[in-house]
Regions:
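Peripheral peptide segments
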Residues: 30, 50, 62, 75-77
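Basic, amphipathic alpha-helical/coil surface patches used to engage anionic, phosphate-bearing ligands
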Residues: 95-103
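Short functional micro-motifs and their immediate structural scaffolds
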Residues: 73-78, 92-95
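Short cysteine-rich clusters marking metal-coordination/redox-active sites
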Residues: 68-71, 87
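Short, flexible, mixed-charge glycine/proline-rich loop motifs
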Residues: 36, 55-66, 77-81
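Cysteine-rich micro-motifs
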Residues: 81-93
Length: 103
């Protein structure tokens, strides 16, 4: 998981997902297969989840689209080419668009 997302919401995501897996009695069998960024949003691959667990992950996918990938602050820009959300302070030089024009 990129540092900014880990800082911005990573712990909260894990706590919510853990509570759901404990509620469903699946915590001991649950395995995370991969966590990454793709097209500017969170991708989380696992060994199987509950419907409510997938709802939690979908919520954080949406949050990731508007969270700076570097620092965890609210994103204001999306870079072109390699699509990633950034705040004004972290946005690299080069082409980018305001986030509200992208989504």
């Amino acid at each position: 998981m990129p540092d900014g997302w880990r800082i911005g919401f990573g712990e909260q995501l894990c706590e919510e997902l853990k509570a759901e897996l404990e509620r469903a009695g699946l915590l001991d069998q649950y395995r995370i297969l991969q966590i990454k960024e793709k097209y500017g949003s969170l991708r989380w691959y696992d060994s199987g989840n509950t419907s409510a667990g997938y709802d939690i992950l979908e919520k954080y996918e949406r949050i990731s689209e508007r969270t700076c990938i570097c620092c965890g602050m609210p994103a204001t820009r999306i870079t072109s080419g390699w699509i990633s959300p950034y705040c004004d302070a972290c946005c690299p030089e080069g082409p980018s668009v305001p986030i509200d024009e992208y989504y």
